[in-house]
Amino acid sequence: MSKQDKYTRSARGQQCQVRIPGICNFDTDTTVFAHLNGAGWAMKHSSIHGAYCCSDCHLWLDGVAPGYTRDEQKLYHLEGVIRTQILMIKNGILVL
């Protein structure tokens, strides 16, 4: 199990912020923190670069997405990161 920090722990019980149409299960019990992919093999960005993500959207981000380009996958993820950062700032989890 990876080391969790306050950002990754804050995903518990949150609404999915990735929200892929036809994929998202909207189940807050399955929400995890989906980090952006890092700069190298098996690397992840810091936890401020992640999104609250339901289990189905997370599987979609990690795998093949028929009908979508990799750039479209990245865009959905980045939009989720922005929405997540706004929530974390609003809730005092991420302080700028």
What are these regions (language model features)?
Residues 24-36, 62-67:
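Short Cys/His-rich "knuckle" micro-motifs
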Residues 21, 38-41:
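Short beta-turn/strand-loop junction motif enriched in small, turn-promoting residues
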Residues 36, 56-57:
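Residues immediately flanking
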Residues 51:
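Active-site cofactor/substrate anionic-group-binding motifs, chiefly glycine-
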Residues 2-32, 54:
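Short cysteine-rich loop/turn motifs with clustered Cys
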Residues 40-48, 59-96:
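Polybasic, low-complexity binding patches
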